[in-house]
Regions:
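Glycine-rich phosphate-binding loop signature in dinucleotide/nucleotide-binding domains
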Residues: 88-93
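Active-site-proximal cofactor/substrate-binding loop regions of enzyme domains
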Residues: 101
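Catalytic nucleophile loop
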Residues: 104
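Non-catalytic, usually N-terminal nucleic-acid engagement modules in DNA/RNA processing proteins
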Residues: 97
Length: 126
């Protein structure tokens, strides 16, 4: 069986920082996490404590600025990036969407239609 090359796409608006090491270990059971991107508004002081732990875990920080309150710019940025990876990086054979937001179902279906392995990690109620 061929090792999967997995892209971890992290929705920081709906994830807890302390679980990230466990999430990465879980992903490693299924393949090699070669892309680790964390999406969020990094100018927001709420995420200031995330920079060092994410850097230590080799995540690339993707800025998703919020221009209007209560809009899902982080979700949209994550979906656009996933689609870009899907169509431009054929060596990516799997995706791990880390979020406790159920809005990603259409993305998951599109990835599966394109024969990609997909993991979803989030809270049980998601």
């Amino acid at each position: 069986m061929e090792t999967k090359n997995i892209a971890i796409l992290l929705d920081t608006d709906n994830t807890q920082l302390e679980y990230l090491p466990y999430i990465i270990e879980e992903v490693k059971q299924y393949g090699n996490p070669i892309i680790k991107w964390a999406f969020g508004n990094w100018t927001n002081s709420q995420f200031s404590s995330w920079n060092v732990p994410l850097s230590n875990l080799t995540f690339r920080l993707i800025q998703s600025p919020t221009h209007v309150k209560a809009k899902n710019t982080t979700d949209i940025s994550l979906v656009i990036s996933a689609m870009d990876l899907l169509y431009t990086q054929p060596h990516i054979t799997g995706f791990c969407i880390v979020s406790s937001d159920s809005d990603f179902m259409q993305l998951v279906m599109k990835l599966i239609e394109n024969n990609k392995f997909v993991m979803g990690i989030g809270r049980k109620q998601t």
